[in-house]
């Protein structure tokens, strides 16, 4: 379920679809718990939905073969309560400012990690961690250029902050499936814009059918 009065947009309407949009407007209920598996890759907190985990394994293997670096998982699936704890900790660290906390951490129910379709990734033996410097690593650069080939998108890109609502995160990949990942990559648009375009196309198609 989503707590927003609006529902997700065609072509995949159910919350288990890979194109389910989650942000500050479209939220997930507290009791939603997806089926997840442990991706067979290096790192911690490796849980993702099965289709996303399989794609992640392929992507990590390709990065090792093509770029010669080992990617590691940092944070995959998170429960509603886990996200709540993370948000509250960030809130404390910024002196209680919700505006500042919202720039960096999703509120509970507004995190793609609860879907089981997102993963924060890093590069082994790199000091960049989950910072903008990850984009300058060999692994980060490879991810930016190639993740779409495996059905992933870089969800929060630089320059899209006003649309996505979140700061630049070169380490955060979201699984949407091959077709949609390629389309978003070629159009160079955030998921919100892509979904809006889909909505408009669906409306046009319905008018034509009438």
Predicted regions: what they are:
Residues 1-76, 80-210:
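Extracytoplasmic cell-surface/polysaccharide-interacting catalytic and binding patches
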